[in-house]
Amino acid sequence: MQSWSETAVPSVPGQGPPLRLFDTADRQVRPVTPGRTATMYVCGITPYDATHLGHAATYLTFDLVNRIWRDAGHDVHYVQNVTDVDDPLFERANRDGEDWVVLGMRETALFREDMEALRVLPPRDYIGAVESIGEVIEMVEKFVASGAAYVVDDPEFPDVYFRANATEQFGYESGYDRETMDKFFAERGGDPDRPGKEDPLDALVWRAVRPGEPSWPSPFGPGRPGWHIECSAIALNRIGSGFDVQGGGSDLIFPHHEYSAAHAESATGDRRFARHYVHTGMIGLDGEKMSKSRGNLVFVSKLRGEGVDPAAIRLGLLSGHYRQDRPWTEQLLADAHTRLQLWKDAAALESAPSATDTIARLRQHLADDLDTPKALDALDGWARRALDHGGSDTNAPSEFAAAVDALLGVRLRRP
């Protein structure tokens, strides 16, 4: 699947401290220690609707990780999937009387446009679930052969399920107790009451063909992949086990990331799928989480269509800490526009105070678990000093603009 266009990233003199991120599995902020090539997998969209601000906040978070690694001199192998075969896509297509393939392609194209407008650096591998069917089948075959998975006793729909106890470390990623797992499994796409399952928490890895659904041939009969195994297969086949960061929204902690890890660990025998599990908070509107099921969405494409500067959208979402649940408001967007203009005015000066210390603070705050509120405050301070008191450093405005562009993805000057 085609990704979106790369945007140029300026080079900024100097180097920041090593990146530290909160790891969901270890429940602490700790260093991320990639090799020469940093590796990251972020779960992508199910393309049955446009990109909302909750999506955007997640992808902006991991765009910062990408930029920080690049600033530190790493090559970055970033992988993102598209869940282009799944129940919500089929349900929306049926509701609207549209071909599910056409719907998925259209919404994926709109997502790419939104990401490009927000200046999110594209993944090296942008992979649809449909493209990874063969890889999934190989994994399911391995599970069945090893006893990690079984076929339910249902002649009509012989689905294949992964045993939740197939790995002894199951549950380490989320840290949830059984009661919480049962609750979220039922709420987030699981099927605990499916007849024939050995354990309500056993996860679907191959869904036998149903009337009106697409299917692919397999040794277990025609069907399609379960949700979690798609990400396991795509990640293992592009960046392997033990990659640096797996990312997504906090609603993916369980079941999706727990099972993606368990599937991969069962397939490889490794103890840990990813070295860091990093999750973003939810974006709310009117006191509730922004979600398709609630219908309280603010779409990036709609804001762009209304003439909102994508850079202001970006700054608005970065104004809060990535791990916090936080609201989106009109005032937040207005403040982001004000901040953007402040920075642009300062970057347009012919001379200003030295920006060296400010750039160092920007790097320091971002390296400290992506502390964007402090990073943005530091930039505000320099911009106000430059506009109010001036300075004699003729390189400072361009250095400031380059750092904001490279590390935050916000362009202050015309190229």
UniProtKB/Swiss-Prot annotation:
Residues binding L-cysteinyl-5'-AMP, per UniProt: C43, G44, I45, T46, T58, N81, V82, T83, W227, G249, S250, D251, I283
Cellular component terms per the entry's GO annotation: cytosol
Record-linked InterPro entries: Cys-tRNA/MSH_ligase, Mycothiol_ligase_MshC, Rossmann-like_a/b/a_fold, tRNA-synt_1_cat_dom
Motif 'ERGGDP' region, residue numbers: 187-192
Necessary cofactors: Zn(2+)
Residue segments, region Disordered: 1-20
EC nos: 6.3.1.13
Entry GO MF terms: ATP binding; cysteine-glucosaminylinositol ligase activity; cysteine-tRNA ligase activity; zinc ion binding
Positions bound to Zn(2+): C43, C231, H256
GO biological process: cysteinyl-tRNA aminoacylation; mycothiol biosynthetic process
Placement of sequence motif 'KMSKS' region: 289-293
Textual note on the cofactor: Binds 1 zinc ion per subunit.
Short motif 'HIGH' region, span: 45-55
Keywords from the named record: ATP-binding, Ligase, Metal-binding, Nucleotide-binding, Zinc
Presence of keyword DNA damage: no
Catalytic activity: 1D-myo-inositol 2-amino-2-deoxy-alpha-D-glucopyranoside + L-cysteine + ATP = 1D-myo-inositol 2-(L-cysteinylamino)-2-deoxy-alpha-D-glucopyranoside + AMP + diphosphate + H(+)
One Pfam entry name: tRNA-synt_1e
PANTHER family per the UniProt record, alphabetical: CYSTEINE--TRNA LIGASE, CYTOPLASMIC (PTHR10890:SF3), CYSTEINYL-TRNA SYNTHETASE (PTHR10890)
Family: Belongs to the class-I aminoacyl-tRNA synthetase family. MshC subfamily.
Function comment: Catalyzes the ATP-dependent condensation of GlcN-Ins and L-cysteine to form L-Cys-GlcN-Ins.
Protein name as it appears in the record: L-cysteine:1D-myo-inositol 2-amino-2-deoxy-alpha-D-glucopyranoside ligase
Organism, as annotated: Rhodococcus jostii (strain RHA1)
